[in-house]
Amino acid sequence: MGALADLVKVLFEPTAVFTRVGEEPRFLAPFSGLAVVQVAIALAMMPYTRPVMEAAMAQAAQARGLAGPPPNAGMFLYIAIVAQPVILLLLLLLSTAVVWVMTSLFGGEGKFGTLLSVVTYSTITFIIQLAVTLLVLAVRGAENIQSPADLQPALGLDLLAPETKGFVGGVLKGVNPFAIAGYWLTGVGVSVTHRLPRGTGYAIAAASFVVMLLVGVSLAMLRPGAR
């Protein structure tokens, strides 16, 4: 239970949590906690995501001239929800690989298992972002959510330029308080677990943030209609 409790404690006592991580890296317990909460939030979002997906699938079927009812959007949503822990795992591994490379460049030898634990605990801010997104959608009401863009309320620099789309818009959306807090935690974690100066830890986290942001936005641009 201590490893799960540290998912909350890391927000208030990051140095103490990452000291324990440095002594004994932990992944399965915090990952399981993140995955369970992520799936619960995704299920709670279904009243907002399902109508949008149904409309998009019906529009796609009409554009292709397909007769009959559109595919079952609910089935696709449940499949996507079940797959979320797998996607989360892949993202954690990718992010850890980037942090490991940056740690090796800036601070010497990086310990992948320890860094995976650091990144996993730092990802709690992403889960908080999902919860805030759900809250915003609930306040707006399902009747006011009609497109995929409505499912991604502005929470970052995109608040300053709401009309900006495409690659730049994706970058602005990615620079938000939750992402910054997550990489701040990563910087603290790298510094504590690898006994590096705090400034070096922050530099590693900042470089990793830039790389992951550019990769994420570039992949998002590959989706149909992203431009």
Model-predicted regions and their roles:
Residues 113-227:
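Hydrophobic alpha-helical transmembrane segments and adjacent short intramembrane/lumenal linkers
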Residues 4-21:
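A short amphipathic helical element positioned immediately N-terminal to and/or at the very start
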Residues 4, 81-90, 132, 171-177:
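Hydrophobic alpha-helical transmembrane segments of multi-pass membrane proteins
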Residues 10, 63-79, 148-168:
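Interfacial loop/helix-cap signal at membrane boundaries in integral membrane proteins
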Residues 16-128:
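Selected alpha-helical membrane-embedding segments in polytopic membrane proteins
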Residues 12, 96-100, 183-185:
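A generic alpha-helix surface/boundary motif
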